[in-house]
C-alpha cells in the first residue's frame, strides 16, 4: 500500500475486493466486513466488492469485472503487484498477443489437445510467440493477472494508466516463510491452519491491524474459514447429485462430472479429494473453482444471466474513509453504475448468486449466529473510518 501511494501519488486509494469466495476457488479467511476494516486501517479510502460472478473466475473474467468497476468510479490509475515489475513489458505482451492472435489461439488448442491445462497451454503458447526480453513470463500467477488487467483496460477503451510493483522474496504460492519479512498468501493460510498455530507466527508478515482483526474474528466467531470446514456439506451435496445434475453447474465440462462423483466416494477430506481429482489437464485452482460452484450451486444458466461478458452491473460499497466519502460525494453524478450501500431491496441476477454465496459462506456457523450474520450482510451499511483518529465510526 505504501509503495502504491508512493508510485502513483494518489489523492485517494480504492480497493476492489472479492466477497466470500476468492479467485483461487476457496473461502476467504474472514468475512468481507472484517477484510474491509483491514483495508481501511491500512490506508484504503474506498472498498468495493467484486461480485461472485466475476471474483470466482479465471483471470480474464476477474480482471474484466474489476476494471469495469474502477472505470465506473473514474479511477485514473491502477497499481498491481507482479513478478515482472516493469509495466512496459505488460503492454508489450498484450500487443504481441494481439498481433499474433491467430497463431496464439492455434498453439493454445494444440497444447490443450496434448493434455495440458488451459493455464499451461497458454503459458507454452506465449513462450512460442514471445521472444523479446521485453515480454513477461506468463507462467507466473501475478503476471497473468496483470496481463489481463492491461488487456481489460485496452478492451474497455479506458483512459486508466497502470503501474506495477515487483514482488520480492516470496511468490504467491510459496508455502513457507522466508527471513525477509515477506510472505505469500498461501504460506500465511497454511500457518494459520497448522497444528499449534499462533497469530504470533505471522505478526511480522502482516500489518498490526490485520493481525488484530484476524484474532478478533476467530475469538468472536470461533473459526477462520477454509475448505475443510465445508467438506461435509460439499460431500453430502455430491452424494445426492447425478452426472446430469452436475453438468448444469458452472465450469463442469468435458466429463469432469464423472471423475468428481467417482473420487468423492473414497475421500475423507477436501485435500484428499483434490489430490485424487487433479490431473495434468486441470490446475488445482481451476478444480477448486469448480468445487466452489458446486458448493454454492452456481449453474451455467445463472452465470449466463449475470452477463459476465459485460461490465459489473452495480457497485457494492463496503467501506470508506472520510476522504473516500468526500470523493464519492463529489463524483456521484458522474458514476453511471448504481452504488449499493446495502442489498436488501436491489434485484439483479448477479446479486441472486451473491446471496447464495453468502448463505453458504456462513453455513459453518452455529445458530442463531448463522442467521444473524446472513441478515446483517444484506442490511449492512458501509463501514466508515476516520483516518485522522484511526477509529471506526
Curated annotation (Swiss-Prot):
E.C. number: 6.3.4.-
Keywords: ATP-binding, Cytoplasm, Ligase, Nucleotide-binding, RNA-binding, tRNA processing, tRNA-binding
Any GO BP annotation: tRNA modification
Protein name in the entry: tRNA(Met) cytidine acetate ligase
Catalytic activity field: cytidine(34) in elongator tRNA(Met) + acetate + ATP = N(4)-acetylcytidine(34) in elongator tRNA(Met) + AMP + diphosphate
GO molecular function terms listed in the Swiss-Prot or TrEMBL record: ATP binding; ligase activity, forming carbon-nitrogen bonds; tRNA binding
Binding site for ATP: 81, 142, 167
Subcellular location per the Swiss-Prot or TrEMBL entry: Cytoplasm
NCBIfam families in the record: PRK13670.1
InterPro entries with a match to the protein in the record: Rossmann-like_a/b/a_fold, tRNA(Met)_cyd_acetate_ligase
Gene3D superfamilies the record matches: HUPs
Protein's job: Catalyzes the formation of N(4)-acetylcytidine (ac(4)C) at the wobble position of elongator tRNA(Met), using acetate and ATP as substrates. First activates an acetate ion to form acetyladenylate (Ac-AMP) and then transfers the acetyl group to tRNA to form ac(4)C34.
Cellular component GO terms held in the UniProt record: cytoplasm
The family this protein is said to belong to: Belongs to the TmcAL family.
Keyword Cytoplasm: yes
Chief location: cytoplasm
Amino acid at each position: 500500500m505504501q509503495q502504491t501511494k508512493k508510485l502513483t501519488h494518489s489523492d485517494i486509494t480504492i480497493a476492489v475486493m472479492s466477497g466470500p469466495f476468492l479467485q483461487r476457488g476457496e473461502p476467504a479467511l474472514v468475512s468481507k466486513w472484517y477484510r474491509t476494516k483491514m483495508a481501511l486501517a491500512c490506508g484504503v479510502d474506498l472498498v468495493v466488492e467484486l461480485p461472485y460472478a466475476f471474483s470466482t473466475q479465471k483471470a480474464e473474467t476477474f480482471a474484466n469485472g474489476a476494471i469495469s468497476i474502477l472505470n465506473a468510479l473514474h479511477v485514473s490509475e491502477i497499481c498491481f503487484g507482479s513478478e515482472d515489475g516493469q509495466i512496459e513489458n505488460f503492454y508489450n505482451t498484450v500487443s504481441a498477443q494481439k498481433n499474433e492472435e491467430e497463431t496464439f489461439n492455434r498453439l493454445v488448442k494444440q497444447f490443450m489437445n496434448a493434455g495440458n491445462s488451459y493455464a499451461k497451454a497458454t503459458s507454452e503458447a506465449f513462450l512460442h510467440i514471445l521472444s523479446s526480453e521485453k515480454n513477461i513470463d506468463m507462467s507466473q500467477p501475478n503476471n497473468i493477472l496483470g496481463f489481463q488487467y492491461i488487456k481489460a483496460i485496452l478492451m474497455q477503451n479506458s483512459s486508466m494508466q497502470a503501474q506495477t510493483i515487483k514482488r520480492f522474496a516470496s511468490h504467491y504460492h510459496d508455502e513457507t516463510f522466508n527471513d525477509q519479512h515477506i510472505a505469500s498468501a498461501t504460506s500465511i493460510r497454511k500457518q494459520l491452519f497448522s497444528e499449534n498455530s499462533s497469530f504470533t507466527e505471522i505478526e511480522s508478515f502482516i500489518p498490526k491491524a490485520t493481525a488484530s482483526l484476524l484474532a478478533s474474528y476467530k475469538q468472536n466467531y470461533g473459526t477462520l474459514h477454509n475448505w475443510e470446514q465445508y467438506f461435509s456439506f460439499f460431500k453430502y451435496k455430491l452424494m445426492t447429485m447425478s452426472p446430469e445434475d452436475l453438468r448444469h453447474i458452472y465450469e463442469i465440462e468435458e466429463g469432469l462430472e464423472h471423475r468428481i462423483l467417482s473420487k468423492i466416494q473414497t475421500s475423507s477430506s477436501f485435500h484428499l479429494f483434490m489430490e485424487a481429482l487433479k490431473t495434468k489437464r486441470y490446475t488445482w485452482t481451476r478444480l477448486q473453482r469448480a468445487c466452489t460452484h458446486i458448493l454454492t450451486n452456481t449453474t451455467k444458466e445463472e452465470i449466463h444471466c449475470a452477463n459476465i461478458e459485460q461490465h459489473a452491473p452495480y457497485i457494492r460499497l463496503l467501506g470508506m474513509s472520510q476522504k473516500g466519502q468526500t470523493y464519492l460525494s463529489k463524483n456521484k453524478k458522474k458514476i453511471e453504475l448504481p452504488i449499493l450501500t446495502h442489498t436488501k431491496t436491489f434485484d439483479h441476477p448477479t446479486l441472486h448468486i451473491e446471496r447464495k454465496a453468502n448463505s453458504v459462506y456462513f453455513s459453518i456457523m452455529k445458530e442463531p449466529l448463522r442467521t444473524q450474520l446472513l441478515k446483517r450482510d444484506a442490511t449492512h451499511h458501509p463501514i466508515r473510518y476516520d483516518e485522522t483518529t484511526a477509529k471506526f465510526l
